Amino acid sequence: MKIFIKTAAILVLLTAALPANAYFVTYKEQYYRLFHVHHIQYPEDSIENIYWLENAIKAPFANPLYALALIENEIQWEKYRYLFTMHINIKLLEQHLFLGNKYNKRHAFFYNAPFKEQNLKSLETAETCYRAALYYWDEALNWAEKANERRLRWIDLPRVQFWQDEAFRIEKGTLNYGRTIERELGFIKDVRERFEKMENHY
């Protein structure tokens, strides 16, 4: 039995000495690759994505050789950085909208009266998520404006064409999350007022 324990201990020590195939996540592009959307998005999925995307915002850019687009000169690199940051902010606001939607109560039904406090707390959580989304929308607008500057307008980055389309749609007003978020905040206000008027029974 003692020989078995010694052998097991030696194997554990040898295994610990072997190099692992892990790598450090350091750059924006690496964090962005960890972002993913599920067919059915649960709150913990949104929170995980928010974590990766917020780290992407804080992280430095990788060398242009490892960019998600083909970068051949400094002006392309500048536009790429603006588009990337805009896109990350859009994804962050979408994740906050998904998360807020899980806590949002669309209607104040009379039979929810006994759960009035829980529903009000849920509405508060949804409002917090929507207000965070509004912050990221403002950030996305700022970065889209930079990406759409006159001197960058004709710089084409085919591998991230979707990001360029987002910036163009923001400029033209066809992509307007601000309107969506304000509408949701208005709904929350109305539903909250109805819950607050309810008695604690039906």
Residue positions per predicted region:
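Sec-dependent signal peptide recognition
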Residues: K2-I10
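Acidic, serine/threonine/proline-rich low-complexity intrinsically disordered regions
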Residues: F109-T125
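Amphipathic alpha-helical repeat scaffolds of TPR domains
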Residues: V25-E48, K79-N112, L152-E184, I188
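Residue position in alpha-helical solenoids
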Residues: A59-A67, Y136, W143, R150
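Immediate post-signal-peptide N-terminus of mature secreted/exported proteins
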Residues: A20-F84, E193-Y202
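N-terminal signal peptide c-region/cleavage motif recognized by signal peptidases
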Residues: T15-A17
